[in-house]
Design a protein with these regions (language model features):
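An N-terminal boundary/leader segment
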Residues: 1-61, 307-309, 380, 490-493
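Glycine-rich, small-residue loops and helix-cap segments
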Residues: 26, 81, 121, 125, ...
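Acyltransferase
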Residues: 30-35, 64, 290-316, 339-351, ...
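Acidic/His- and Gly-rich active-site-bordering loop/insert found
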Residues: 69-144
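Short helix-loop capping/hinge segments that flank enzyme active sites or metal/cofactor-binding pockets
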Residues: 79-99, 272-281, 333-398, 402, ...
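Glycine/threonine-rich flexible loop motifs
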Residues: 97-106, 291, 421-429
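Short glycine/serine-rich loop segments
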Residues: 112-247, 440, 445-452, 458-461
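A short helix-breaking turn/cap at a secondary-structure junction
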Residues: 200-302, 485-493
């Protein structure tokens, strides 16, 4: 602590950018910051079960080294001394990597995910691995290895998934930011439910390397590379200003994820926004109707832009109701994915046996991922002809949206039909992921942001979408709307 000035502030409420600046200026100690984050996580964990694995001792060692680097005037990375968490299934060499599966209960990561390696090189310190849905196959965080993660605003409600544990740690002030992954809303859905910012970057920007299907065993398989093209790793943050900094650090080709072809640099000045398209689609087929709170949030977002002189237009397409099935069709027809291969961790999956074991109280798999795998097998039975019309709808939407996204336009629409529902609700409403999942197969960047208000005690959110490679436009919009609506609100823990 010698040489470090002390400031009287709640460090846990600050952004990663602010914390890095204070550490660099010797205003706060990385050691003190890590201890405060650990203390907060020890408060939150018994209430929400957000953490899968604690990395406390390694983090303390890293913080001591980070403090020494500051005091001795050594070169510092952009996020030097700033703690973060990451999804358990991403992979941190030597740490557990069960992905929430009993079949992998003794598995440890043999390598560190590219995005985590880049954050470490920037000086950030991993504090914990976040709980997740089993094999990242469900929009709720509940598994047979680590248990269920609870929402910090109302513990009777879901934290979302699959990156639910990290979203809760960010929302409750345990870490300033986290790394998640998104193949069908797995960053954006928990971000929405926990009142934080979550970005699924443009296709081709951030490598998935380390996470299924680009893990140590599968990364070279053609099907793995094809599936990864519809996934992305990305940041979860309390403040919009952190999104771009983290994105700059983690973006760019690594030679493993063959879908990646570019990096990201924040532009020196914001591109003026000229048009905002407001979309309030009919409910996704077999999904939940939009709540009044979410509908009002989308409309009010448009109104705030109109007040700034931005042109605001309504936009929709009838095929948006098929969003879930478009997502499923693309994955089935263009990647040949079989979720049973992942749920069974490469071993054949016997559905009758798995269902019998679940009914007998001896489950092998979490209910949600097992249902997802069954639904996926139904898609196999439909075959390509049965799914072909959804591929045509994908092509139509891609063309229509590409015509809207001219580099100065964004789309505003729901991320979820309402606020976080009760635990287990996704079993009755799995199709609700369509609002987010659609943009995985379209490839456009999509960002979920909190509206600074609550409904039924839980955060309300909207989703922003821009053209391919126009991530900076989304980040600027997030900063504007954060100022307009207030952004993150501290949960009552």
């Amino acid at each position: 602590m010698n040489g470090m000035a002390q400031v009287r502030t709640d460090l846990l409420d600050l952004s990663a950018v602010q914390l890095a600046w204070l550490i660099r200026g010797k205003q706060i100690s990385p050691v003190e910051l890590i201890e405060q984050c650990i203390a907060r996580l020890e408060q939150v964990q018994p209430l929400c079960n957000a953490m899968a694995v604690d990395l406390f001792e390694a983090a303390r060692d890293a913080a001591r080294r980070a403090e020494e680097d500051v005091l001795k005037g050594r070169p510092l990375g952009r996020l030097h001394g700033v703690p973060f968490s990451m999804k358990e299934g991403l992979g941190l060499a030597g740490a557990p990597k069960t992905c929430g599966s009993r079949l992998r209960s003794n598995t440890r990561a043999r390598s560190t995910a590219t995005v985590a390696t880049r954050l470490l090189a920037a000086g950030a310190i991993p504090l914990a691995l976040g709980n997740q849905a089993e094999m990242a196959l469900w929009p709720e965080t509940d598994n047979l290895v680590y248990g269920r993660t609870l929402n910090p605003y109302d513990t009777s409600r879901t934290a979302g998934g699959s990156s639910g544990g990290d979203s809760v740690m960010v929302a409750s002030g345990c870490v300033p930011f986290a790394l998640g992954t998104d193949g069908g809303g797995s960053i954006r859905i928990p971000a929405a439910f926990n009142g934080i910012f979550g970005l699924k970057p443009s296709r081709g920007l951030v490598p998935l390397s380390g996470h299924l299907p680009l893990d140590d065993q599968r990364w070279s398989l053609p099907v793995s590379q094809a599936v990864a093209g519809h996934f992305a790793a990305g940041p979860l943050c309390r403040y919009a200003e952190d999104l771009g900094v983290v994105l700059e650090v983690i973006a760019g080709s690594d030679g493993i994820d063959r879908n990646i072809h570019s990096g990201y640099q924040q532009p020196p000045q914001a591109t003026p926004l000229k048009r905002v398209f407001i979309c309030l689609p009919a409910p996704v087929k077999w999904g939940t109707p939009l709540s009044p709170a979410v509908t009002a949030a989308v409309i009010e977002t448009g109104q705030r832009y109109a007040d700034q002189g931005v042109e605001v237009q309504a936009w929709s397409e009838s095929c948006l109701t098929n969003a879930f099935f478009i997502w499923l069709a693309v994955l089935k027809c263009e990647t040949r994915i079989h979720l049973a291969d992942y749920l069974g961790d490469g071993q054949p999956l016997n559905y009758p046996r798995a269902l019998y074991a679940a009914l007998a109280g001896r489950p092998q798999f979490s209910r949600g991922p097992l249902l997802a795998s069954l639904m996926d097998s139904c898609g196999d039975r439909l075959g390509n002809p049965g799914l072909a019309r959804f591929l045509k709808q994908r092509d139509h939407l891609q063309q229509a949206l590409a015509g809207l996204f001219d580099g100065q336009s964004i789309l505003v629409l729901p991320a979820t039909p309402g606020v976080a529902p009760a635990h287990g609700s996704a079993l009755k409403r799995p199709f609700d992921i369509g609002y987010c999942a659609l943009f995985n197969v379209l490839g456009f960047p999509a960002l979920c942001l909190p509206m600074g208000r609550l409904d039924q005690g839980c955060p309300v959110a909207v989703q922003l979408v821009a053209g391919l490679g126009q991530d900076a436009l989304l980040l600027e919009a997030a900063r504007f709307l954060e100022m307009e609506f207030g952004g993150w609100r501290k949960p009552p823990l």
